Amino acid sequence: VSGAFEHTINMQFKGQFMRAFVLQGATPQIVLGINPKTMPNFKTIADLKGKKVGVSAPGSSTNVMVNFLLAKVGLKPSDVSIIGVGTGNGAVAAMRSGQIDAMSNLDPVITLLLRSGDLKIASDTRVIAESEKVFGGPMPAGCLYAPQTFIDKNPNTVQALTNAMVRANKWIQAAGAADIIKAVPEGYLLGDRAVYIDAFLAAKGSLSPDGMIPEKGPQSAFKALASVDEKLAVAKLDLTAVYTN
């Protein structure tokens, strides 16, 4: 599976042993942005108290980031109203119409709103240093993972997938905007090449250069999940079993 690193922890909690074996995204690439129309005088995260905050879906990683940022200024998740807005046109419309005062979301939504002046960045985990500040350590994101049984039975296949992904990681680090446009299928460009290129360039630094999963990454991911799941928070899990380099 190509998916979020934290799924390996969630699956172990449910009794299914998955292991991540090569990293794609070194950070979650989530951005918290403020609505300049409804919050023109925004100064700090504490100003979000009592406000409506859009997330891709309640309980998702975009919601987790909001919880972490609120906690840093002494606020509880219940101090804001969390509203699910998706990651597409609905999210853009919610921001532009003033239905929400802030939004925790991903590209291309963030870049679209930035370009039209409908969003002001408050926290940007596309920047590795900012991501580590928010989550208290490295927060691995997109990766390839598989059931431990598959890895044990198919070591050559797993190694081949790893080699291919590391080559892709290295190619992306060296690639320019024109290279990306040539390589990416038209359907992924969302009908707007300029937005896609802007989003890619903003996120490029958060893509893994070598596929290596950071040793402290599982702890950061566990803490993030524990913030939205009380049962998982008290579970005894083997975090060394959720990844391998």
Residue ranges with predicted function:
Residues 5, 64, 144-145, 178-179, ...:
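A generic alpha-helix surface/boundary motif
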Residues 90-93, 97-186:
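Pocket-lining segment of extracytoplasmic ligand-binding domains
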Residues 234-245:
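Hinge/cleft segment of the Venus flytrap/periplasmic-binding protein
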